[in-house]
Amino acid sequence: CDIYPIPSVLAVFFDSASKIVGMAQPSMAAAKNSLLSELYPEILNAETGFIDGTTVNMEALAALNPDVVFYSSGNKELGKQLTDAGYAAIAISANKWQYNAIETLNNWIDLLSQLFPENNKSEKVRTYSESVYNMVQERVSSIPDAEKAKVFFLFQYSASNISTSGNSFFGQWWATAIGAKNVGEELDSDKSTNVNMEQIYKWDPDFIFITNFNTAKPDDIYNNTVGSFDWSGVKAVKDKNVYKMPLGMYRTYTAGVDTPITLLWLAKATYPERFEDVDITAKTKEYYSDVFGITLTDEQSARIFAPLTQAGKLSVK
């Protein structure tokens, strides 16, 4: 599947990964370094060699003998290839809902519930995710524009590259959903876009959220350990407001089963005084237990918010 969060969504939806025979390398790298492989060790048996980026080796796929193949709805060519080869090919979109992570998760679960009605989780997921969204809105909707926190999502980061969310990607939705301002919203681009330090200094964000699509940790920003970038004058760095995003069942920047918890975590990190009563570890346990019947220990729950560096690598080589 070339929609990377989907294997984790399937595993949690079925409460089993035994039927997942293949996935892309970025999905496997996240699985290996997250709770997903601890809860469902059989996921590590899935093959990754049949897909490279968006290119599928049809011979290698045939060897896996899948009953159903999920693919990105944007990849029409692959959809045709799969259908022509006789597979039950199911198109899944990551951007049909304008990168609204809550709606994307709800619709993914709706689709899976239609395909596999005996595992129907539509109502439970939708009820919980919408209650979290509404609770956050109640607490942040009154924040005047002039007082909204300015947030910067560090999507990918290397010695030669900094990328963030423009106005049409998950970062824009997350920022709006927590009553903040995505500093990259002036960038009219779909998905991520490259920026330089001069631009970041101009924006001077109050908060920096580092995704798990790179291996950087807050200390790498505080200590300027990557390339020759100097972050020391940025407000978020001076105020020690640089955070690594959680890694639950998958990288939480995108839509996925962790989305309701990610929304709460982001809101609490940005506006701690408005979410003082929210115990994020307890909420995580409650969510997985009530919605999916999955019991997490306090330690497992807390680990979601202290992700491993290796999860930021997009290959398992």
Put a short name on every predicted segment:
Residues 1-2, 19-24, 68-72, 89-93, ...:
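Structural recognition of the beta-strand scaffold that forms the well-ordered cores
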Residues 2-62, 68, 73, 183:
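A short, structured surface patch at a secondary-structure boundary
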Residues 4-7, 26-29, 68-70, 74-78, ...:
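Solvent-exposed loop/turn segments at secondary-structure junctions
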Residues 14-15, 62-63, 82-84, 143-147, ...:
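Extracellular/periplasmic catalytic domains that process cell-envelope and extracellular macromolecules
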Residues 56-57, 78, 195-199:
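Short acidic active-site motifs
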Residues 78-160, 185, 237-238, 244-316:
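Extracytoplasmic substrate-binding proteins
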Residues 164-191:
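Alpha-helical, coiled-coil/dimerization segments enriched in small aliphatic residues
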Residues 193-247:
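A contiguous binding-surface segment within folded domains or other stable secondary-structure elements
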